[in-house]
């Protein structure tokens, strides 16, 4: 955990600055509640992270069906906002359908969506290289992808880091060498540094991007939490799906990560809930890290 937090802190200069979403909030003293359901009367909508809120690994969190039903009963609007870019958000939605969760496709937004929205602003002459190997390549004419066996490191004029499941030291060395030679920009569609897995943490694109920055000084653009574009996109889709307006200080992001979920929500003018029972802080330490990093949620909840 400490290593993951250290990488996030090293990336803080590239992250947005938090702000207080509620003028009356005692933001440096988060309110602790036993269950997330207790805050439902305080909000009109929730953005739910995927891992650590809806699921852990390949299984849904105990009680998620009951929580979603209670949110609906209290007329709280729901969106899923996840840092996931290896595949399209439709894959995540299909998983939720398999579990019997009552989301429709329009309610699920991933960090890949924010990158996809940016593609129209990139010249068609730029060859975009999708990395790593275990991803669905970006749908763009003339693009190249490791997943397709293309010579990405020699052909790409821009690298799009979508996932890191198949990424290793040889790939990292090749990326750093290519950028050192060609000075291509690096777009990170999943800013996560690490995710709990099998008693430890996986290295996610944010971790490898931090190493690339240190080694090459590469110019980076970020498209998932905590960066503003993904929150604005999700907010727009929230209002479109429910066909009504929402006040930002009545919308809360629920997640297990201080540096992505909580910081990003604050910077976007939303409220936030740190859920500690299932994800990054499932073994404790949330209070200490909040004070160390000075990233404050509005609420801390242990379980759903």
Where on the chain are the PLM-derived regions?
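Conserved phosphate/oxyanion-binding catalytic-loop motifs
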Residues: 84
């Amino acid at each position: 955990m400490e290593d993951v937090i250290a990488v996030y802190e090293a990336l803080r200069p590239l992250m947005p600055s938090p702000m207080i979403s509620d003028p009356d909030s005692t933001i440096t003293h988060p309110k602790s509640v036993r269950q997330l359901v207790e805050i439902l009367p305080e909000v009109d909508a929730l953005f739910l992270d995927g891992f650590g809120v809806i699921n852990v690994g390949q299984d849904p969190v105990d009680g998620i069906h009951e929580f979603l039903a209670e949110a609906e009963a209290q007329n709280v609007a729901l969106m899923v906002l996840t840092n996931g870019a290896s595949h399209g958000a439709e894959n995540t939605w299909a998983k939720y359908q398999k579990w019997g969760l009552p989301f429709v496709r329009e309610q699920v937004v991933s960090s890949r969506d924010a990158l996809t929205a940016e593609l129209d602003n990139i010249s068609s002459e730029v060859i975009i290289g999708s990395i790593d190997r275990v991803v669905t390549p970006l749908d763009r004419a003339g693009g190249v992808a490791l997943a397709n066996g293309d010579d990405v490191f020699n052909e790409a004029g821009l690298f799009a880091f979508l996932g890191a499941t198949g990424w290793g030291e040889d790939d990292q060395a090749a990326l750093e060498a290519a950028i050192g030679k060609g000075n291509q920009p690096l777009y990170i569609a999943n800013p996560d540094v690490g995710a709990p897995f099998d008693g430890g943490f996986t290295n996610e694109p944010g971790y490898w991007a931090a190493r690339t920055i240190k080694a090459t000084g590469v110019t980076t653009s970020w498209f998932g939490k905590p960066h503003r574009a993904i929150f604005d996109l999700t907010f727009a889709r929230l209002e479109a799906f429910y066909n009504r307006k929402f006040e930002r200080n009545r919308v809360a992001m629920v997640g297990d990560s201080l540096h992505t979920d909580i910081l990003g929500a604050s910077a976007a003018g939303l409220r936030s809930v740190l859920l500690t029972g299932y994800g990054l802080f499932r073994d404790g330490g949330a209070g200490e890290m909040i004070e160390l990093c000075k990233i404050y949620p509005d609420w801390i909840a242990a379980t759903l």
